[in-house]
Every structure is written in C-alpha cells, then in structure tokens.
Amino acid sequence: MGSVADDAEITGPLLAAAAGGGGDSAAAAGVERVPAWREQVTVRGIVVSAVLGVLFCLITHKLNLTVGVIPSLNVSAGLLGYFLVRSWTAVLGRLGFVIAPFTKQENTVIQTCVVACYGLAFSGGFGSYMLAMDQKTYELIGPDYPGNRAIDVMNPSLGWMIGFMFVVSFLGLFSLVALRKVMVIDYKLTYPSGTATAMLINSFHTTSGAELAEKQVSCLGKYLSISFFWNCFKWFFSGVGDSCGFDNFPSLGLAAFKNTFYFDFSPTYIGCGLICPHIVNCSTLLGAIISWGFLWPYISTKAGDWYPANLGSNDFKGLYGYKVFISVSVILGDGLYNLIKIIYATIKEVMNARSKQGRLPLVRVHDDDEGSKLSAEEKLRNDTFLKDRIPSWLAGSGYVGLAAISTATVPMIFPQVKWYLVLCAYVVAPLLAFCNSYGCGLTDWNLASTYGKIGLFIFASLVGRSGGVIAGLAACGVMMSIVSTAADLMQDFRTGYLTLSSPRSMFVSQLIGTTLGCIIAPLTFWLYWTAFDIGNPDGMFKAPYAVIYREMSILGVEGFSALPQHCLAICSVFFVAAILINLLRDVTPKSVSKFIPLPMAMAVPFYIGAYFAIDMFVGTVILFVWERVNRKESEDFAGAIASGLICGDGIWSVPSAILSIMRIDPPMCMYFKPSLTS
C-alpha cells in the first residue's frame, strides 16, 4: 500500500478517466441521469446481496475458525455482484422482460450491503470473544487454572447470539453518519480501500472495463471450480478425525511435520497469499520460523525446569501457555503502538486543519490547469453527495434510542455486565469510533479489534472476579461492533462519493446489510458449530483467538500471577520488540521500511502453527514471479484467481458440513509414518 499522500495525488486523475469512459465526466454530466436514491436500492440487488452474504460469511467463518487471518473480500464482492446482476438481466432479457439498466450506483449499493453483512461474521466475534465464552474453551484452559471459573461460561445459542447482534450492531451506523461531509468532502480522507473499490466499480461500467470484468469473472469461475473439486477430492482421503489426508501431508519431512512445517494443499491460504501484500506473507513465515523453528523447541527443552514435564500438549501451565501469552504480547504491543500512532495523527491533522484556516488534511494543491479539469466533476460528486441528506436529528435520536435499548437488553443477555457499564461504553464509543474512522481514512487500518481489547481489559478489571471474564468479553463485543461498523460506513461513503451514489442509498444499504448479517452470520456459524469439532487445538477448526481472548479477559481479572515461570519476562521482551519494530518501520526510509516485518502478522503462527504460513508464502511466490513475467496480467487477474480459490473452498464447506451432520465419513485415511528400520 502506498503512502496516503500518493493515494491523494493519483486518485483524481484515475477516477476522472474511469468516469469519463462511463459518461460521468464534466462534459457528460448534463447527459447522464444519476438515478434517484430509491432506484439505486433494488429488489434484485438485495437478493444478490443476501446470496453473496451467505457465501462470504461462510468464507469469513472458515478463516476465522482456522487461522484468524481474513483478507479483504471487498473486490470479490464488487466483482461477483456485477456478475450476478449481469446474469440476472441477461436471462430475464432473453425471456422478454423489460429490465432496468444495471448502474454503477446499484453495483456500489450491492457491494456495500454484502460487506456490511459479512463484516458481522468478523466483528460479531464468532471466532474470538463470543467463542471464548464457551465450555470447550473453558475446559481447554483448565478448570484449575487461576481465574478460569465454571460460572464464566456461556455456550453458543442461536437465540442469544442473534439477539446480541441486533442490539449492538446498528449503533455504529448512527454514531458518525452526521460527520460524513466533514470526513469525505472537507477533510478529503482517502480511505484507500474504499477508493480502490470505487475505481473498480467505475471501470466495470465502461466498455473496456466491462470486457475486462467478463474475463475476470470467467477466471474466477474457473479457479472456483478447481478449488471446489480439489476439496471434494481431498475429502475422500481425509478419514475419520483430523490426522489423515492432504491436510496432514508431511511434504517437508516427518521431523518438520512435527513442528507444523508442511504444505497442506489449501486453496484458501494460497489465495490469501495472492491477495495479501508480500510483506504480510513474508512476516507470517518469519514468525513461524522464529516460533516453531527456534523458540518452542528451546522452551520444550526446559520441561521439568521451567514447567512440569508431564503436562499435556494443551495445558496452560506448560509450553502451551508460553505459545498463547507470547502471541498475546506481540498482538497487544503492535495494537498499542498503532493505536497511539493513529490517535496522534488524528489530533495532529485536526489541529493543522484548524490552524491553517481552511487548508484541510490530505488536500493536494493542484496546478490551475489540472484543478480546472477536475473541478466540474468534483462539483458533480459534491452535489450528488450532499443532495440526499441524512438528517442530523435522525442520526442523533437513532443513536440515543438504540443505546437505550441496548443498555437495557445487554444485561439481560449477560447478567455480569451492569447497565451503567454499558451506558458508559456508549458514551465513550462515538469518540473512539471517530478516531478509528479517521485513522482508517488516513492509513487504511481498521483497529476495531484493538479498541475491543481495550474495552475487554477495562471492563474485566472493573467487574473483577465475580463475572469479570464474561463482562470483559461482552464489552469487547460492544466496542468492536460500534467502532468497526462506523469505519466501514465511512469507507462506503467514500466509495459512494466517487461512484456518484446517494449517501442515503448507501446508508439504507448498510442498514439492510447489517440486518441480513445479524441473521446470516449466526446461522452460518451454527452450521460450522453443529457439523465440526470447533475449538479442538489438534483439529482443523482450532479457533485460535477464542483461547487468546479468554486468556486476555482472565489476565484483566487476575493480573500476571497465572503466567508460567519466566513467561512474563519473555512476553515483556516480545511486547517491547513489537513496539520497536513498528517504530523502526516508521522512522526508516520507505526503501528500507518495506522490508521490515509486521509484528501482527508474525504473531499469528506463534500459536496456530507454521503450515498456513507456508501456504501463504507459496501464494506470494507465485504472485512475485507472475509480476516479474507479466505485471499487467497479474494486476488484472491475481485478485480474481485468489477470490476463486477462496470462494471454492468456502462453498465446499456447505456439502462438507452436511456430510458431517449426516455422519457420512470419508472412505479412506491417507497417513504417513517412518520407514521400518532393522
């Protein structure tokens, strides 16, 4: 990702070109009619959004419950939305029906609705704070573990999960909607992902862009089919349990396999490697080498000295405890640094905006000729964005009303959380939502999980041992939902601004998508919950962040007394190292900093294992070579191939879950063992 300044400089010309092709340039502004906001929200769009919402929720859950690494699927949502509606109109057109034209505004609304829907599969905590409350996570940590009490257990249930989603997921939409003009027009925040999505959608609705989109859809469908049938083929050899098949193929040897170094032929993680930046994939592999190549083998030699030698592989008093807490320390160090960095940048830019009397953040001073070329189109975008206002009284009363309902309802779901604590959270939340949304606009980083962890620690420590664990986890959910949805909404406003979409249609689309997500996300999670062994540390669906979040909540209640010997010292070293590495990335020149690893990406394999890092590295090597051979082709089709690989794997999870529910086991078990020696 380039710098924010770079984004601000290139955005205008590129969008002008894309819009010009579609008839949105200044010259064509009087010819093309921008649809009314009600025409942008269509029945077919809602149906397509619901279908894609199910697919992307399945994908998000699978990634959440396996490794916890979720790439951005916004481009995939826009591309598949374009394909499905185009197919819809083509079929009905051949049947003789009169079909309304498919506009870029409708495409934007669909993409917004899908992202709002599957975003709740992440911010809903189905692989983190919500799952951390269940019986299995409690038992995995151990009933005799300090602070881990049996009363702090709440198993997943569709009733309370859907109810909780409805009472907390809408507040973020109302918290900052009144500031949309300030953030998008006045401050001209770039929201790089939102800008990239707008450029993509604009390109779809040009002649050349439509041709490329058709090729991308064809490519996506091809690799989706390959991924689906490959997973089907793998299933026949996966046997009963989690120790058979290609997922446990010792491709680097049996010794490396014992330390989780193997290639498991996963299309999903290869696809993630194609989508994620090279530095993320390389950082993940480096973290795997440091932890599973050196650190864990070294600590394991201290069995009987630092910790009892006869403990199980998942006992927190042994090596397992080091794995979890060192991962937590790196994640917290990285999150704390970036939180302080974003808040500092936010305060600095706001103060500069005030002191310079109208010179706003991220405004590039264009030459007069360039400014005159873009001014007419920018005026059209501004007029469109400001035409369909969302009344401030609606935003304010909506937030207050929803906060009142949530304040009364959340304690009914979680009795450990008192109403006045929920109220305090909703008083502070808009400020945190602004910080996160502004920071996301500057850097493209959504730090919702970091704000959630802060709420977790504060509430867990305030409530104490009498229910603090559940209270902290629930508070994490409240904060994450508000902060995450507010940033997503503002990013979607940026996309809508650049595609001449009405802010009112974008807001309605977010409401519809959130409503769908409150139902679809729990239902798709329930499919996994009933079909697979979720939370088994030796299985496929490890749910790594469930254990991490519960341990953080226990840490907020108990302090550091529960850590194994020398664990606090090692955690402190890694916590400081995460901060220093981030600082080094910021103070060194870009030519150097691009090679410095990301601590957050390094932390993930510390707990999960090295296998997925190898898969992602395979993806990044493929992309690297492809970029050297044909950069234009890689830019056009790498995302489509990655999306196909990920989507095919996600679709396979449905028949796989059905087979599991019906107790139909694979017919063969393929496994490996050392050769017999004399």
Curated annotation (Swiss-Prot):
Alphabetized InterPro entries for the sequence: OPT (IPR004813), YSL-like (IPR045035)
Localization per Swiss-Prot or TrEMBL: Membrane
Coiled-coil regions listed in the entry: none
Membrane topology recorded in Swiss-Prot or TrEMBL: Multi-pass membrane protein
Gene Ontology MF, one: oligopeptide transmembrane transporter activity
Tissue expression, as annotated, is:
Expressed in roots and leaves.
Q: GO CC annotations?
A: vacuolar membrane
Q: Which UniProt keywords are listed?
A: Membrane, Transmembrane, Transmembrane helix, Transport
Task: Check the record and name the Pfam families matching this protein.
Answer: OPT
Q: What is its main location?
A: membrane
* NCBIfam families noted in UniProt: OPT_sfam
| Protein family (similarity comment) | Belongs to the YSL (TC 2.A.67.2) family.
In UniProt terms, what function does this protein have?
Answer: May be involved in the transport of nicotianamine-chelated metals.
Q: What is this protein called?
A: Probable metal-nicotianamine transporter YSL6
* Species per Swiss-Prot/TrEMBL record: Oryza sativa subsp. japonica (Rice)
